């Protein structure tokens, strides 16, 4: 059922507003403007350039001539008499002229230094090279730099071959360039995983922040049927909980992946719990990294991690910094136990 104010609205959709406004007289336009002012007194619906109304309805007296206006203003300025000063200037100078005081010239008097006759004789008979070596030993680098005989090539005390500068300069800082972007082709890698390429064993998507979330989910979906990729890393790719859930579903099916890196992302406790639940039945994954997420995971999540590590004997490396002492100790003991089991299996295999 149509509303009353929309009952006849369809009859006015094809009307031309410009044609209707053109047929209105001046009085009708003013009346329409008054009605619009009542509806929108602040003119909020109009652009800023159309809110100012015409201040006068007078017709122009003539065309605007800029040069004529400038000449008129200049003529008016020249004909206008300057205002007389209230206090006329008489030329009288008040006060005194500042004359700086002359400071007496300081005369430097040389201090007479008396040395022992042996030292006096040794310094008098010393060569330029010996004097340069002596100044270097005493730390008088300014003297060495100012003297013309500071070339100390072949000095016996191992003084540097170069001149000693007057200004101490800091160590030259070597420029540190940014790391190059990740050269991995995302679309090509996804295609090769989907085709189960035997040459593709490791996929590195680290620090590629423009990968869409659906594309990351596609990686998880294609890894379910892949039998060659053993290392997959997507650190710092802005992955969130839906991506973590997709990879958790992949871990329940995949029997080839050995290492998974999901550090430095936006995964919360819910996404981490999904990964932990998937690892309870996974027997192939040996390394998982989930540290440095956007927010702390909490004590309950850390307890679930420790419980999973105690049940899953295949995890040898677990990348997470525990905040609680209890889960940290349990996880460390579980990882140590798992590595000991691998060592025992290797020893038994060597004996057989």
UniProtKB/Swiss-Prot annotation:
GO biological process terms held by the UniProt record: actin cytoskeleton organization; cell motility; erythrocyte development; mitotic cell cycle phase transition; pointed-end actin filament capping; positive regulation of mitotic cell cycle phase transition
The alphabetical list of record keywords is: Actin-binding, Cytoplasm, Cytoskeleton, Phosphoprotein
Q: Where in the cell is it found?
A: Cytoplasm, Cytoskeleton
**Tissues expressing this chain:** Ubiquitous.
Pfam families in UniProt: Tropomodulin (PF03250)
Q: Which cysteines are joined by disulfide bonds?
A: none
The answer to whether keyword Acetylation applies is: no
Record-linked Gene3D superfamilies = Ribonuclease Inhibitor
Q: Which InterPro entries did the record assign? A: LRR_dom_sf, TMOD
Residue numbers bearing the Phosphoserine modification: 25
| Any one GO MF annotation of this record | actin binding
A GO CC term assigned to this protein in UniProt: ruffle
Oligomeric and partner information: Binds to the N-terminus of tropomyosin and to actin. Interacts with FLII.
Spell out the family assignment given in the record's similarity comment: Belongs to the tropomodulin family.
State what this protein does. Blocks the elongation and depolymerization of the actin filaments at the pointed end. The Tmod/TM complex contributes to the formation of the short actin protofilament, which in turn defines the geometry of the membrane skeleton.
Recorded protein name is Tropomodulin-3
């Amino acid at each position: 059922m149509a509303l009353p104010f929309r009952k006849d609205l369809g009859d006015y959709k094809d009307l031309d507003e410009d044609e209707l406004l053109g047929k209105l007289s001046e009085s009708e336009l003013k009346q329409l403007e008054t009605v619009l002012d009542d509806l929108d007194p602040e003119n909020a619906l109009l652009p800023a350039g159309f809110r100012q109304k015409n201040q006068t309805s007078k017709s122009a007296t003539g065309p605007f001539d800029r040069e004529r206006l400038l000449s008129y203003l200049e003529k008016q300025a020249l004909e206008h008499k300057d205002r007389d000063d209230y206090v006329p200037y008489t030329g009288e100078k008040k006060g005194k002229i500042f004359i700086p005081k002359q400071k007496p010239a300081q005369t430097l008097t040389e201090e007479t230094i008396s040395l022992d006759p042996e030292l006096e004789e040794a310094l008098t008979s010393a060569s330029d090279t010996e004097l340069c070596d002596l100044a270097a030993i005493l730390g008088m680098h300014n003297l060495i730099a100012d003297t013309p005989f500071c070339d100390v090539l072949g000095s016996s005390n191992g003084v540097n071959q170069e001149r000693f500068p007057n200004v101490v300069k800091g160590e030259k800082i070597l420029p540190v360039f940014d790391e190059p972007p990740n050269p991995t082709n995302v679309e090509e890698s996804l295609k090769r995983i989907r085709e189960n390429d035997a040459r593709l064993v490791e996929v590195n998507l680290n620090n590629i922040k423009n990968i869409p979330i659906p594309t990351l989910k596609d990686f998880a979906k294609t890894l379910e049927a892949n039998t060659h990729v053993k290392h997959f890393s997507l650190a710092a790719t802005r992955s969130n909980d839906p991506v973590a859930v997709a990879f958790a579903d992949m871990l329940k099916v995949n029997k080839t992946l050995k290492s998974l890196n999901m550090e430095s992302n936006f995964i919360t406790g819910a996404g981490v719990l999904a990964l932990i639940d998937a690892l309870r039945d996974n027997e192939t994954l040996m390394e998982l990294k989930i540290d440095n997420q956007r927010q702390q995971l909490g004590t309950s999540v850390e307890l679930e991690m420790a419980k999973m590590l105690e049940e899953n004997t295949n995890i040898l490396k677990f990348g997470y910094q525990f905040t609680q002492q209890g889960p940290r100790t349990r996880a460390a003991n579980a990882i140590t136990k798992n590595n000991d089991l691998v060592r025992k299996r290797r020893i038994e295999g060597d004996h057989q």
